[in-house]
Amino acid sequence: NQDPSVTIRLHNRSVSRKIALNPRLAVGEAYMDGSLTVEDGGSIYDFLDLTGSNLHVLDALTIVRIRNWLSGWTRPLQQHNPLGVARKNVAHHYDLSDDLFDLFLDSDRQYSCGYFDSQNSTLEQAQKAKKRHLASKLILDKPGLKTLDIGSGWGGLGIYLHQETGANVTGLTLSKEQQKYAEKRTQDLQIQGDVRFLLQDYRRETNLYDRIVSVGMFEHVGIKHYGEFFNKVGSLL
């Protein structure tokens, strides 16, 4: 019944300071670049499991309490998300090389979590199951329903909804690369009249829709803009 233990090695002095200041980011980056390693036959999973079971101890530390207080005070400023800032944030994250995203996404470039209904599901199967699950929740029970996809990414969900249900889909994205890629897909599939993707902030949309879906985009809205988001969605239905 010995208490669990994990041995980690920090390979330079700056790592401990970075972890103390921003553990959520610094631990992952240190493990990724090799400046934090797990020793004596342990794994990163052992380390995370042990850390998770001791969060109450960490939260009691003075430095952690100060950091949490500062984080809570500055979070509204960090998440201030007016139109111009939103566009720059999206460009920084998504307007990158296609080759990069193809390295780790499924063939449909779904960027949100898959729906793993089996331990043996592949990434492709999980992402298709997610799209099927979303379509079911939207109750697209007749062709031609006008459907808005806020944060439409590379277009996979919108195209799937049209192909499976006959929905008329408009997707909104702030990424030039995503919009260009998604529009090319509609051209290749010859469905431009039924599915379109616009380079536009959802706050500028004025058309009315039968259904609205937004997957994995809400984290970009910002706490101060939650009410604005739901009010806008309500006005478009």
Identify what each model region corresponds to.
Residues 154-166:
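Conserved SAM-binding loop of SAM-dependent methyltransferases across substrates and taxa
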Residues 213-218:
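A conserved beta-strand element that flanks and buttresses the S-adenosyl-L-methionine
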Residues 143-151:
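Conserved class I S-adenosyl-L-methionine
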Residues 189-202:
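Conserved SAM-binding strand-loop segment of SAM-dependent methyltransferases
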